[in-house]
Amino acid sequence: MPIDRNNVTNAGNNQLILSNTVASGTNRSILDLSEFSDAELAGYRLRCGVWITFVLATGFVIAAKFSFGHETTYTDKGKKPVGGKFLSFDHVKFWVGNAKQAASFYCARMGFEPFGYRGLETGSRHIVAHAVKQDQIIFVFESAYEPGNEEMGNHLSQHGDGVRDIAFKVEDIDTIVRVAKQKGAKIIKDIWEEKDEFGIIRLATLQTYGDTHHTLIDRSKYEGFFLPGFVKASEDILIKHLPAIHLKFIDHIVGNQADKQMEPVAKWYEECLQFHRFWSVDDTQLHTQYSSLRSIVMTNWEETVKMPINEPAPGKKRSQIQEYVEYYGDAGVQHIALNTNNIITSIQNLRKRGMEFLDVPDNYYDMLKNRLNSSKVKIIEDLKILQELKILIDYDENGYLLQIFTKNMQDRPTLFIEVIQRHNHNGFGAGNFQALFEAIELEQAKRGNL
C-alpha cells in the first residue's frame, strides 16, 4: 500500500493507529506491533523524540508518531480561492496605554526603529500612532488622546496592551470582501479609500476572533512609505549605540482561543478568507503532566501568511492557553514569530539590549545531542552556543528550525515574541513543545497561576 502522507497514533496495548491519506480521504487501520518479531522490525530511528521510522521486512516504511500523538501536515490545499490574493502580513496594530513609550520599548529592546507618526501635528485629533519598523516588520502602536474614548478605553480595561489588528497586504480586495460577506463575516468597515500625494490606498476591516480585527490593504496604486496621514518619524539617536538585531519578517501570528473554539475559528478562516489547513497537532502530543493544548495552522493559498490557532485542553492544572484567555479577557494574539537568518547574533544582541527569554534546562540539550547522533540532519550552528543562549531546536528528515521565546512583553501574562530561523523546515516546533510548556509553567508557578 503506497503512503502519500501518514500519521500513526499510539493507541496503547502495543498498537498504533495508521492513518493513510489518499485522494478520496483518510484511511485508518490498526497496526498491532506484537504481530511483528524483532527481526521483522528491521530498524528504527528516533527523531526529536517524536518520529520513529519502522522498516518492516516487507519493505513497508512507516513514519510514526509513536509516543506523543497526532500531528498532521496537510498536502491538500482544497478548493482554489474564487479570487483575491493575500500577499503578506502588512503590519500589526497594538492598542496600548501609552503609544510613545511602547514604541520606544520595542525600539530599545527589540531592535526596531522609528518609522512613521500620526498625531495632533498631522491632523489626527483623537488617536496618536507611532509606527516602528525592522526590515519587513512593521508594528503600529496607538493610544487615545482624550479621556472619553470609550472604545479604546474599554479595550484597554478588558485586555490591557495587546494586538488590535493584524493587517494583510492583498490584491483584488473587492473579491475578498465579497466572499467574506457571502460567508457571513462581520465587516467592521466596508471598503474605503485613503489618498495623499503618493496615490490611493484601498482598505476594509473584518472581525476575527475575540476583539481582534483584520484590515485588508490594497497598495497597488500607492507609492507612499506607509499609509496616508503618516509622516516619517524622527530619528532616535539611541539606536546607533545599540547592537543590530536583524529580524526580517513576520513568520506567523498565533491566536489563543477558549476551549472548544479552535475549530469554529479555523472554519471561519476556511470559509470567510478562503484559507486552508497547513499543520495541526492535538493534546496527546502537546502536553505535560499539568496542561495541554491543540493547534491548527491556517494559511492562504500561496502559504505566505500563517495563522496558528490554539485552544486549551483539559489538564490537571491551568494551561498556558487558559491563563492567557483569563488575563486577556477573551481570545487574542498570544505571540508573534519574527524570522531571522542568523538567530545566534540576533539573540546575543537582544540579550545585550536587556531582553529576557524563557529558560531551558541543560538536560534538554543532553537529550538533543543523543538524538542528533542517530539523525541524518546536521545542525550547522554551534550547539554549545545554542545551549548558552537557550535556543530550542526541532528537526525532521528535511531540515530543522531554531526558535526562542521572550518572556511576556507587558505586565499581564499575555503577549510574547518568538524569534525563529528555518533551515528547510516548515513546522512549528512540535518537538520543542514539551520543553516550552515546562518553561512557561515555571513562569506560571512564579505568578501563582499554575
Give each language-model segment a name.
Residues 68-100, 163-166, 223-266, 329-339, ...:
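N-terminal beta-strand motif that seeds the catalytic metal site of vicinal oxygen chelate
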Residues 66-220, 225-231, 259:
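An N-terminus-focused feature that recognizes amino-terminal "leader" regions
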Residues 3-11, 18-23:
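Short alpha-helix boundary/capping segments
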Residues 89-95, 112, 132, 139-141, ...:
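Short, structured motif recognition centered on aromatic/hydrophobic residues
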Residues 116-128, 145-165, 170, 174, ...:
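A cross-kingdom feature marking solvent-exposed beta-strand/loop segments within repeated
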Residues 83, 96, 335-450:
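C-terminal functional regions that serve as terminal interaction/effector modules
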Residues 44, 87, 93-138, 182, ...:
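Core segments of cupin and vicinal oxygen chelate
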